[in-house]
């Protein structure tokens, strides 16, 4: 245990995802040794992201305006929506340059163990977008893990009565993995080999 401010910093850093006690301590001591101007830049970046960044009113992606840049882009294909769990998945798919449609970010995945059900996700917003009638295909690009598969199955069953083409990214993505960590080639091939879901 360290005194006051140092221990408080370590504790707060340790609350970040993927940062354990040892990493929190290393980061804290790095910040203590850093130039004051460097620490101020970090603080300003943290404050700016909280003040300026919001979620897109259309798709749920991160944005600094009411709509994200993808929703504002008139060159995107309005007939295809790719459903992902988190904004980081949009970034991963965009890196492939394979997809030119629109996105819908759910804000997570169905996880009974974590107490997350369909009502906790942006499913109603997805259904509202689809009811507008422009979309002909929905690509379910949830993570290839238990929660992602449960979410994709739930959505496929929900969408079936709408008569839309519902596809899932092809295998090639490791089961239990996250889209964020897939390389561009693997993710690109998964897009090319997506398959229809029949439930």
Curated annotation (Swiss-Prot):
Keywords tagged on the record: DNA damage, DNA recombination, DNA repair, Metal-binding, Zinc, Zinc-finger
Molecular function terms from GO: DNA binding; zinc ion binding
C4-type zinc-finger residues: 56-71
Any single biological process term in GO: DNA repair
Cystine pairs: none
CDD domains listed in its UniProt record: TOPRIM_recR
UniProt cross-references to SUPFAM superfamilies, sorted A to Z: Recombination protein RecR (SSF111304)
Family that this chain belongs to: Belongs to the RecR family.
Protein name, entry field: Recombination protein RecR
Species name: Thermobifida fusca (strain YX)
